[in-house]
Amino acid sequence: VGSEMCIRDRLPEEEKKADYFLTFLADELSVEKTDILDFELTVYCKENPEFIGLNDDFISSPRLDNLTSCAALISGLIDAGRMEGINLIALFDHEEIGSHTKQGAGSILLHDMLRRILKELGREQTAEQDLYRSMLLSVDVAHGIHPNQAGKMDLTNKPVLGRGFCIKEASSQSYATDCGAVAVIQQICEKDQIPYQKFVNRSDLAGGGTLGSIASALLPVKTVDIGIPLLAMHSARELMAAADQQALKDLVSAYFG
């Protein structure tokens, strides 16, 4: 043991770190270090989500971006009662790094999947018309207005936590929203009394973007970008209003029918 420690002490610092982790990984998997050819490592915050605030009206949690949207979409699809047409959700990988991977929104995965479904339904010859009549919801979180950075927002289009989900628009088309799709969502919200608000990116500052523009370029259908406003987006713990999650879930359920 003494000679092994002496040899290890003479290794370069980076090699020591790699050796230390490989030893840990090999022990966890009950294999030899030499059996490990490669690995991927992702770091997660393991603290539990919490309701916070005077009336527990806020949620503090890791990964609200974009688990909030995934949860609302899955619930809405399960609750859907409409039997005609196709209800489909796609939970893509790699949105935070550009979406241009084989399982990201920048791939032909969704386009090909819809084509195959239409073919199996005997609608291959009318696929273009079917797609033209379709609509895409791009659901991702939005930056809520921060009390310490209020000047970063357009004063007339600021998303406030607790006032419903956001319909997101941008003249740069970083959000894929078009007026026809907005009208559909607004009508649903007004009919079912679902709270919503509009958010427009400032044209003189770089703002966020979503996979909506990427996906709709490959699948040219009416599209609207929506999502829940957050504070501290991309931090280890993010903050949202619990009522906004209910509003988003209600909208998705009504949208799927």
Role assignments for model-derived ranges:
Residues 31-40, 83-89, 122-133, 189-203:
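Flexible, glycine/charged-enriched surface loops at secondary-structure junctions
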Residues 48-61, 166, 229-232:
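Glycine/charged-rich beta-loop-alpha catalytic/anionic-binding loops adjacent to active sites
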